[in-house]
């Protein structure tokens, strides 16, 4: 067990294998598997939830753990964060954001409410689609912030792109402010997603 848990790759593969075994067991208890729209909808919802947890988890890690504690780290130790931990976290952060939005759009399409949600149900007046639509737009805005504001500014702030010290400091502040904007939007976004799935 120690060998399995000492390797992240082995741990993730074992988790995936366990999930597949559970999936097969539960579906066989339900008279087998039909690879139909319901199956694909379930699969994309599962993917959507997993990558959304990673995305928002990293967003909250940056805002609740890393940013508030950077001032407490001695200057000689800061390169460990800026050169190693932050770039790795930002890789998963930005790709989780992209896959969350993409899987959410596919899920909405498979369930037949993509257009209704994207137009906030104007014209049809379906409250569930209005709620999920608000959540989708908030998620799209947040993902846009990740890819087109936070990431470019973080590259300058972390020294991944050469720039002068003044631009580096300005970029760090801009990245932080947009990260905080995403934190501000995260609870309303999650609220509308949960409302759409559970109140209607």
Residue map of PLM features:
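Polytopic transmembrane helical bundles with strong interfacial aromatic enrichment
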Residues: 1-200
């Amino acid at each position: 067990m120690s060998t399995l848990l000492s390797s992240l790759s082995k741990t993730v593969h074992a988790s995936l294998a366990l999930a597949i075994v559970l999936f097969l067991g539960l579906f066989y208890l339900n008279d087998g598997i039909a690879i139909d729209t319901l199956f694909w909808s379930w699969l994309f919802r599962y993917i959507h939830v997993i990558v959304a947890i990673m995305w928002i988890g990293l967003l909250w890690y940056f805002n609740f753990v890393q940013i508030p504690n950077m001032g407490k780290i001695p200057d000689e130790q800061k390169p460990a964060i800026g050169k190693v931990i932050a770039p790795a976290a930002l890789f998963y952060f930005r790709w989780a954001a992209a896959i969350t939005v993409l899987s959410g759009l596919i899920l909405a399409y498979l369930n037949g409410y993509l257009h209704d949600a994207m137009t906030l149900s104007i014209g049809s007046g379906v409250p569930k689609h209005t709620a999920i639509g608000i959540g989708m737009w908030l998620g799209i805005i947040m993902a846009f912030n990740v890819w087109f504001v936070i990431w470019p500014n973080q590259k300058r702030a972390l020294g991944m792109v050469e720039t002068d010290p003044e631009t580096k400091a300005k970029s760090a502040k801009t990245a932080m402010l947009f990260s905080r904007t995403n934190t501000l939007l995260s609870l309303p976004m999650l609220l509308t997603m949960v409302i759409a799935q559970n109140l209607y």
